[in-house]
């Protein structure tokens, strides 16, 4: 499982011009699920993200978590995070989990975040989406589990 975590001032995801999810201050999560991932990875990722201190306090130190700042999450499934680029010029996605299992696990991940008291908006699994965001920092972390 790979999650790209971006601290944002605001973010939105649109499908065919219609906004399906949007947040103000918070985290944009790009979520890639690999073959072999399961509940263990989903729970660990949700715990880590819920507790991660990546927002600045009054002193400018990254001491605050998303709940501390009243932030929201926009979760977007993105299988291309599992691209293998070692050979040739065309990325291979053989390590990415296939639907419908990947869709189910992404939904479980989002529910784990909600269980931890977080507000979660989402894109739509498998859709052609346009993601708009304003990075804060920029502050980006890649979480591999």
UniProtKB/Swiss-Prot annotation:
The UniProt record lists the keyword Hydrolase: yes
One Gene Ontology MF term: D-tyrosyl-tRNA(Tyr) deacylase activity
Reaction catalyzed: glycyl-tRNA(Ala) + H2O = tRNA(Ala) + glycine + H(+); a D-aminoacyl-tRNA + H2O = a tRNA + a D-alpha-amino acid + H(+)
Similarity field: Belongs to the DTD family.
Record-given protein name: D-aminoacyl-tRNA deacylase
Gene3D superfamilies membership: D-tyrosyl-tRNA(Tyr) deacylase (3.50.80.10)
SUPFAM superfamilies found in the cross-reference section: DTD-like (SSF69500)
Comment on protein domains: A Gly-cisPro motif from one monomer fits into the active site of the other monomer to allow specific chiral rejection of L-amino acids.
Alphabetized UniProt keyword annotations: Cytoplasm, Hydrolase, RNA-binding, tRNA-binding
Source lineage: Bacteria, Bacillati, Bacillota, Bacilli, Lactobacillales
Superkingdom, taxonomy of origin: Bacteria
Pfam families: Tyr_Deacylase
Signal peptide: none
Keyword Cytoplasm: yes
Compartments (UniProt record): Cytoplasm
Residue positions of motif Gly-cisPro motif, important for rejection of L-amino acids: 137-138
